[in-house]
Regions:
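N-terminal accessory regions of nucleic-acid-interacting proteins
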Residues: 1-35, 80
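Structural beta-strand/beta-sheet cores of well-ordered domains, especially the beta-sheet scaffolds
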Residues: 21-25, 47-51, 92, 223-225
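Generic beta-strand/beta-sheet core signal
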Residues: 25-28, 54-56, 97-98, 223, ...
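Intrinsically disordered, low-complexity Ser/Thr- and acidic-rich flexible linkers and loops
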Residues: 36-42
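Active-site-proximal helix-loop-helix substrate-binding element of RNase H-like nuclease domains
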Residues: 44-199, 209, 217
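Extended, well-ordered alpha-helical scaffold/bundle regions in very large, multi-domain proteins
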Residues: 205-233
């Protein structure tokens, strides 16, 4: 019998984060053809199953995971998406790890992002172009000496016979919340650390170029490239 101790609960409210300069976000998704066809956000295949948010400024530290499409334990989808839309409308910096993926999913839901978008994965590539691994776990261990605790997620997935990552949507939110919140809070901590390294290496100009180009790259991904199938064959 599966008896892993669970202490996680979904947030009981929607805090006003409008005064924060930096907000980290991480999406959990159902994306069945990700490995074979790429992000389902572009093809409208799959869905967002939950959104994690984290802030840490001025002595106030908060993180929360809002589940909307898990097997059980979901919050009201419309209310959550309206809250996320409100946050994305703030004129501050939104931080992601692999922003192209998360921002594409938000765009597919009709949620635009105002303000600057920072991608810790891009920052990593600028700081160390010879780096082999760019996963959040790898980066947080190298720069923060912290790794995510995936015990509850992995044990619950094993007990229910599902893949803990690609089939996360099949798990009740209570088994995913802690893991998802850590994704957002560690992304934020990593950003603060990498920002110091960007400063030390004087990489501001090239980072600004990457950041300014990003919205255009997202739009290009959705528009695609016209292909003449007859000539292609």
């Amino acid at each position: 019998m599966f008896e892993t101790q669970i202490e996680w609960n979904a947030p009981d409210g929607f805090p006003n984060l409008s005064k924060f300069k930096y907000i980290a976000m991480d999406l959990e998704t159902k994306d069945p053809s990700l490995k074979s066809k790429g992000s389902g956000a572009i093809r409208k295949e799959g869905e967002i199953i939950g959104i994690a948010i984290a802030v840490n400024e001025g002595g106030f530290k908060w993180r929360g995971y809002y589940p909307i499409a898990h097997a059980a334990g979901n919050l009201d989808k419309k209310i959550v998406l309206d809250y996320v839309r409100e946050i994305c409308a703030y004129d501050n910096t939104k931080i992601f790890h692999n922003a192209m993926y998360d921002v594409s999913w938000l765009k597919s839901y009709g949620i635009p992002i105002k303000g600057k978008i920072a991608d810790t994965m891009v920052m990593l590539s600028l700081i160390d172009e010879n780096r082999l691994w760019f996963s959040l776990n790898s980066a947080t261990w190298d720069y923060l000496k912290i790794s995510k605790d995936e015990k509850i997620l992995n044990e619950s997935a094993a007990a229910q016979g599902v893949d803990p990552k690609s089939e996360m949507y099949k798990l009740p939110a209570m088994y995913v919340g802690q893991y998802a919140e850590a994704d957002a809070s560690l992304t934020l901590d990593l950003y603060y650390k990498l920002a110091q390294e960007i400063e030390r290496q004087d990489l501001h100009r090239v980072l600004k170029l990457e950041t300014d180009l990003f919205p255009c790259l997202v739009d290009m991904r959705f528009k695609g490239v016209r292909v003449d199938e007859e000539k292609a064959h």
